[in-house]
Curated annotation (Swiss-Prot):
This is Activator of lactoyl-CoA dehydratase. Signal peptide: none annotated. Keywords: 4Fe-4S, Iron, Iron-sulfur, Metal-binding. [4Fe-4S] cluster binds at residues 125, 164. InterPro entries: ATPase_BadF (IPR002731), ATPase_NBD (IPR043129), CoA_E_activase_dom (IPR008275), Dehydratase_Activator_Redct (IPR051805). The lineage of its organism: Bacteria, Bacillati, Bacillota, Clostridia, Lachnospirales. It comes from Anaerotignum propionicum (Clostridium propionicum).
Length: 259
């Protein structure tokens, strides 16, 4: 039996195809979000990789901001539930999930059975999200991929005191004009993102193991900063952008069994 999970996010769409509720046969990401083409492109890539067709899918669950825009889904489930489901499948010891996506950040507390105990979310401001990093990369004339490497070369941390993206952008420009090292500024940017995410995690009381997911988890500089703020090891989920879609595919498998 094949089931499908689609995660329609603000910056990207993800598709995961699961076989018999346990084997991942495709996990694809396209950098197009809630627009109509994003989910379909992710789905097309998943079908291409797996060699499957639409008719092979027994059940489909959509999640993410744009989940109601994907008309082929049998069911829609919140991204909080799907991230929890996906992470518990991958890392059963997870008790705290830190998810930093394109437009929001979340902290989710799990019990020992993978149930959600608490969750906290920042979706009111771009600061502390992938969007914040994109803005800073543009100002610093670098790429998101290069930022983690430049962070490693930093000799100090140039703190970013502003919690608003617009003011933080001005602060970074001022630091550059004052001759502050770009690498040190990048380290400060990563610390700023990490601090906001860790603030959410601390609100519920931190429990180990801590697992990071979302696109920003691919940035080793942010992961190091999160570990430093929390003073604990941080596990990066395998293929961290697709954990929500994986959770959706797992929910789809459960639903298909009840049909």
């Amino acid at each position: 039996m094949y089931t499908l999970g689609i995660d329609v996010g603000s910056a990207s769409s993800k598709a995961v195809i699961l076989k018999d509720g346990k084997d991942i046969v495709a996990a694809e990401v396209v950098q197009v979000g809630t627009g109509s083409s994003g989910p379909q492109r992710a789905l097309d890539k998943a079908f291409e990789v797996s060699g499957l067709k639409k008719e092979d899918i027994s059940y489909t669950v959509a999640t993410g901001y744009g989940r109601f825009n994907f008309s082929d889904a049998d069911k829609q489930i919140s991204e909080i539930s799907c991230h929890a489901k996906g992470i518990y499948f991958l890392v059963p010891t997870a008790r705290t999930i830190i998810d930093i996506g394109g437009q929001d950040a979340k902290a989710i507390r799990l019990d020992d059975k993978g149930g959600i105990k608490q969750f906290f979310m920042n979706d009111k401001c771009a600061a502390g999200t992938g969007r914040f990093l994109e803005v800073m990369a543009r100002v610093l004339e670098t790429t998101l991929d290069e930022m983690a490497e430049l962070d490693e070369q930093a000799t100090d941390t140039a703190p970013i005191s502003s919690t608003c993206t617009v003011f933080a952008e001005s602060e970074v420009i001022s630091q550059l004009s004052n001759g502050v090292s770009r690498n040190n500024i990048i380290k400060g940017v990563h610390l700023s993102v990490a601090s906001r995410a860790c603030g959410l995690a601390y609100r519920g009381g931190l429990e180990k193991d801590v697992v990071m997911t979302g696109g920003v988890a691919k940035n080793a500089g942010v992961v190091r900063a999160v570990a430093g703020v929390l003073k604990t090891d941080v596990i990066v989920a395998p293929n961290p952008q697709t954990t929500g879609a994986l959770g959706a595919a797992l929910y789809a498998y459960e639903a298909a069994q009840k049909k």
